Amino acid sequence: MKKISVYFIMLLLSVASLHAAAQITPTALTKKQVNDWFQKREWLAGLPLQPHASINKTVFARQYQLNKNYWDKAFAFLKEHDLATMAAGRYAIDGDNVYAIITENPTKVVDSAKWESHRNYIDLHLVIAGEEKIGVADITKLTVTMPYDVTKDLMNYSGDGNFYTAVPGTFFLFFPLDAHRPNITTGGNKPDKKIVIKIRYAE
């Protein structure tokens, strides 16, 4: 009898655990819950940055819940390093799950910059010094010019989108449905220094 009672209690605990998990599953978040979570900025862990208004908050909340460890490591990297003094190159954060690429390049005229998107990774873009324009568009509203290349995790497009000026202190996030057109000049052949953190996308 005691053995049956123990199994019954364990079953109840398992069901309760699954129920609790269902209550916090990212797909169950309401718009208000997403907005509250986003506005609290606890996920920044004190990092003095501003998320750009173009960020899809619902997708961000879901990805953060699914891969919290990856996101925390990405934001910790930004907080713990003096980006202004770091050389251009690739920096490991969590193997192939999270890594950073710092570049210092002249910005381009808009016709030289391509629309792109990625399936396996989310892009976090942050200008460290200088400025650039970044285009943002829904991939469903663009025309594919280069089919998905699995080795490069890259797809290119043509079409129209919205353009924003990226400056130090504000970061952009681009998810698989977000085409982006970065490194565009704001006038003249100005160089800028930026960091892109690649964060593995959770299906």
Model-derived features: positions:
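Bacterial Sec-dependent N-terminal signal peptides
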Residues: 1-29
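A short, N-terminal "cap"/entry segment at the start of jelly-roll beta-barrel domains
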Residues: 34-102
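A short beta-strand-loop-beta hairpin characteristic of the jelly-roll/cupin
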Residues: 131-166
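A short hydrophobic beta-strand segment most commonly corresponding to one strand
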Residues: 171-173, 189-203
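Generic beta-strand structural signal
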Residues: 120-124, 132, 162, 170, ...
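Mid-length scaffold segments of soluble, non-membrane domains
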Residues: 82-144
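Short proline/glycine-enriched turn/loop segments at secondary-structure junctions
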Residues: 184-188
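Conserved metal-binding segment of the jelly-roll/cupin
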Residues: 165-183
